[in-house]
Amino acid sequence: MLIVGAGPAGLYGAYYAGFRGMSVALMDSLPEAGGQVTAMYPEKVIYDIAGLPAVRGRELIDALLIQANQFSPTYLLGQQAAELAHKPDAVVVTSSQGLRVRAKVVVITGGLGTFAPRPLPTGTAHLGRGLVYFVPKLDVHTGQDVIVVGGGDSAFDWALALEPIARSVTLVHRRDRFRAHMSTVERVEASSVEILTFTEVAMVHGEEWIEKVELVQTRTGDRHVRPAQAVVAALGFTADLGPLTRWNLTIDKRHIVVDPTMATGVERIFAAGDITEYPGKVRLIATGFGEAATAVNNAAPLVDPSAKIFPGHSSDDGTGG
């Protein structure tokens, strides 16, 4: 089995395929396993994983790697899945770097697909000099005045994570309604984080490093300047499926349409996780785990015709799950 995407759903799928006795390879365009969690949210605390009241992103990925590595999957990192060819009883996936992988089944767990952060409207002149899109290491911002821009989960999560170590945290959003989970919004509102609504960043000042930020109140036009050594632009990401759009998959708003078995409609191609679309779809890491198991189990008879869809329980044979 080839799993395209080494994020949480892909890593759990690799474990589950190994548990089912399959040999597994994971292909990902990123240089490290863990997908968006490793690349963007390693310090973010995740609260909605079953059995884990709170876990940092990097800790979750470390645990998933330990679980998957019981069955020694092959990691093909820095390789973007590009071309698909069908052979008798198999498919061949060629990466953008020319690596060819033959597999009985492919499970796509590519998350957002190819993604790029949305820049601040003021530009990227201070990128790497105080302007960041995500916070891979919290302690870098110890004692700083931090401006977090955005109204979604990432903005509120980072504001909450930075509040205990930063000198000050200000969250600015151009509206007075937020996309973030209500419980997180309430926690930020109860903290020392200052929330400024109907506010945008008008200008970032500083020579070698950010020194101050000019904010504008969009309803009144009033401007004020406050000190800042860091600006976290949590404005979301633009994403597309890249070469996967050439695989004859059914696409709905940058997501791959699947049926209840996680099959895509293209022979021997399944999908799971945030990249999928079906009626009632909820995009959570937690649901991605179940979708990965569903995809692997339904794909199992294509790998081994004698295999059953239902695998039994891991507790029956002592295999960790």
Curated annotation (Swiss-Prot):
Enzyme Commission number(s): 1.18.1.2
Pfam families registered for this protein in UniProt: Pyr_redox_2
Residues that coordinate or bind FAD: 28, 36, 41, 81, 115, 274, 315
Signal peptide region: none
An example Gene Ontology molecular-function term: NADP binding
Catalytic activity: 2 reduced [2Fe-2S]-[ferredoxin] + NADP(+) + H(+) = 2 oxidized [2Fe-2S]-[ferredoxin] + NADPH
Cofactor(s) essential for the protein: FAD
Domain of life (superkingdom): Bacteria
Assigned keywords, A-Z: FAD, Flavoprotein, NADP, Oxidoreductase
Cofactor info, note text: Binds 1 FAD per subunit.
Matches recorded under PANTHER family: THIOREDOXIN REDUCTASE 1-RELATED-RELATED
Subunit architecture: Homodimer.
HAMAP family according to UniProt: FENR2
Family, as annotated: Belongs to the ferredoxin--NADP reductase type 2 family.
The name this protein goes by in its record: Ferredoxin--NADP reductase
The organism of origin for this protein: Frankia casuarinae (strain DSM 45818 / CECT 9043 / HFP020203 / CcI3)
